[in-house]
């Protein structure tokens, strides 16, 4: 049978399975593909196919992830499943696999466990705002009161980390039964809940314009050009933009031309690599590391709290721990900025392989917002990967 080409006729959503080890994340993923395959919305993926996740290198960090795609009547999904707990931690902090929402798999027989809590916390930190709960292995629980108790526990846990524990859908069932006995109503219910509860993300082109500046040069007689890849939004000739970062004050200019592949355009959009001609800006007034942005959409900051994964020695990271006051480079978008680290109270040092919250103060401000990813580098090599969880000032 010929492969159908990817039709973009449905909204696209990225999701993933999260939860404690052995609660059935991968089995649930397999059950979803089998159930949706009956309606022609997926190719069947067995547990083994998903479980032998290929190793991927994301910014030098080794992560095992399985990517599965499927569709319901309403949407097209890309679904990520990780075999190991460490893979989840790395995945969520580095943003290797973006998630618009998540399916939290909890064994009804065991209830919430330590990694259940940790994954919920991570999801809340990295901007996954919607979680649908699947209480798996319900066939192993004879007492309906016990099921209610577990559901209550999970809802309380979600509320504790800022999710809407009262409103989020909880679907009860057995992924294994769905696979082995074709008893897949619970999976249909689960996907209906995902369809209805996890909102379609705002497309990158609908967000306010932002382009990190990669290079700057002068065209004689025309002015200064900043080049880079448009991260989000749309830019039109004649738009006013701000120049943000690397300095305390915010610059302002008007776009007098947009060029792509040596052709002049009227507009550029998210994903385009462009050169933007800036009115009245001198060559030395703009530099790599700044961003061009829609006025008022992003501001420069020096102090923030970040959730960071510290690379292990085997991943090319440090061989030794670091301590309070450590001063590496923080790589945001297109440039390195030196910053100093303050560790949480009671934490003496950070070992390679740890993940931790840290307070950072940069020596120059960077255009920054929550959920912005960064790398920590030392002498040009990456030693950590992080995400901004809150801006201090």
From Swiss-Prot:
The tr-type G domain, residue ranges: 10-202
Taxonomy, superkingdom: Bacteria
Region of interest (G3), ranges: 81-84
InterPro entries (alphabetical): EF-Tu_GTP-bd, EF-Tu_GTPase, EFTu-like_2, EFTU_2, G_TR_CS, P-loop_NTPase, Small_GTP-bd, T_Tr_GTP-bd_dom
Location of the region described as G2 in the Swiss-Prot/TrEMBL record: 60-64
Keyword match Transmembrane helix: no
EC number: 3.6.5.3
Localization, UniProt: Cytoplasm
One term of GO molecular function: GTPase activity
Primary enzyme class: hydrolase
Function noted in UniProt: GTP hydrolase that promotes the GTP-dependent binding of aminoacyl-tRNA to the A-site of ribosomes during protein biosynthesis.
Recorded family membership: Belongs to the TRAFAC class translation factor GTPase superfamily. Classic translation factor GTPase family. EF-Tu/EF-1A subfamily.
Protein name: Elongation factor Tu
Organism of this sequence: Clostridium novyi (strain NT)
């Amino acid at each position: 049978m010929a492969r159908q080409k990817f039709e973009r006729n449905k909204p696209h959503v990225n999701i993933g399975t999260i939860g404690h080890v052995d609660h059935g994340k991968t089995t649930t993923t397999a059950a979803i593909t089998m159930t949706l395959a009956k309606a022609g919305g997926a190719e069947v993926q067995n547990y083994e196919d998903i479980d032998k996740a290929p190793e991927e290198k994301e910014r030098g960090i080794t992560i095992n992830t399985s990517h599965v795609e499927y569709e319901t009547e309403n949407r097209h999904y890309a679904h990520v499943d990780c075999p190991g707990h460490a893979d989840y931690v790395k995945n969520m902090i580095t943003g290797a696999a973006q998630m618009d929402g998540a399916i939290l798999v909890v064994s009804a027989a065991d209830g919430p466990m330590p990694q259940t809590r940790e994954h919920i916390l991570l999801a809340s930190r990295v901007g996954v705002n919607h979680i649908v709960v699947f209480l798996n292995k319900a066939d192993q629980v004879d007492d309906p009161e016990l099921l209610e108790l577990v559901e209550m526990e999970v809802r309380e846990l979600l509320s504790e980390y800022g999710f809407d524990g009262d409103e989020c859908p909880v679907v009860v069932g057995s992924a294994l039964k769905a696979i082995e006995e074709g008893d897949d109503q619970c999976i249909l219910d689960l996907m209906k809940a995902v369809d209805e509860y996890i909102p379609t993300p705002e497309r990158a082109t609908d967000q306010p314009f932002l382009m990190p500046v990669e290079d700057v040069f002068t065209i004689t007689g025309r002015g200064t050009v900043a080049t880079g890849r448009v991260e989000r939004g749309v830019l039109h000739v004649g738009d006013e933009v701000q120049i943000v970062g690397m300095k305390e004050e915010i610059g302002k200019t008007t776009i007098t031309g947009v060029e792509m592949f040596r052709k002049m355009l009227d507009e550029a959009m998210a994903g385009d690599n462009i050169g933007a001609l800036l009115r009245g800006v001198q060559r030395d007034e703009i530099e790599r590391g700044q961003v061009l942005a829609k006025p008022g959409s992003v501001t420069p900051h020096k102090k923030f709290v970040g959730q960071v994964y510290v690379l292990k020695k085997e991943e090319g990271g440090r061989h030794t721990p670091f301590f309070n006051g450590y001063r590496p480079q923080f790589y945001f978008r297109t440039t390195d900025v030196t910053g100093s680290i303050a560790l949480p109270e009671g934490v003496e040092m950070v070992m390679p392989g740890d993940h931790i919250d840290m307070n950072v103060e940069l020596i120059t401000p960077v255009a920054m917002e929550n959920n912005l990813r960064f790398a920590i580098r030392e002498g040009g090599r990456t030693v950590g990967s992080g995400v901004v969880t809150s801006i201090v000032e």
